[in-house]
């Protein structure tokens, strides 16, 4: 098969032997990728979305759908998720939903702010920013579960669990939703998942839950909550921030990291395309002073004294900026 991966340069295509980059006309970042049943490769970017399709020469050609949206004013709409629902392709930004039926595109501003979209079976769910969990019905978003019932945390993934659904939250672990009831899903690593912030999750064909975190790599957990394995920069991962996960037809796991890609052969070794070990993470900004330095990275804000980096307490996870204002150190942080 062929893998398609979005990155800062465009759409990457990997056939098992070689990589090929397909740029958008705007050369913007590709934030989201979805393969339609008709083979079209849908992609989302900043105020841009559309699809790649092969021509008669077997080359991928991009078709924009943005200009097909009528009576809609774009305003910083970045497409973070693409899925299908009720026979349509759905593109999601933090304030809008766009529906493509194969011919026309309709854009709507949502009353609440969708953080994501994810599909379990035939149902599409959507976590709302600072709100509860909704389902995407034919007539729009409908409230399903109040935020307080899910640990007052954002649901970042939903996966099949027996006859129900396992919802994984960013900071409060997992919850099983079945027959209208919600039960806590207990694991051997609940404390770690809550500490390191769950960001993505997929399920393998042998019902293993692969859970990616923002600051401590990947956990593999079975249905009973037993930890099967864990990978981070202390073992073999080159980066601890997991931005995407995918289980392929051979039951292998692909992880999109903040810096590079990891390929995990199930029950085997991990192979990397960018192998350097950097526990401090991907550096976004640096502030140098006389006797110390500060580094803002995807793992947090670090203070370096005598060549020893120390994570500043309370500023774990992604730190985007560090600067000095008078005698104060300012940090732009994901929190």
Regions found by a protein language model. Give the residues of each.
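Carboxylate-rich, polar loop motifs that coordinate divalent cations or form catalytic acidic clusters
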Residues: 1-335
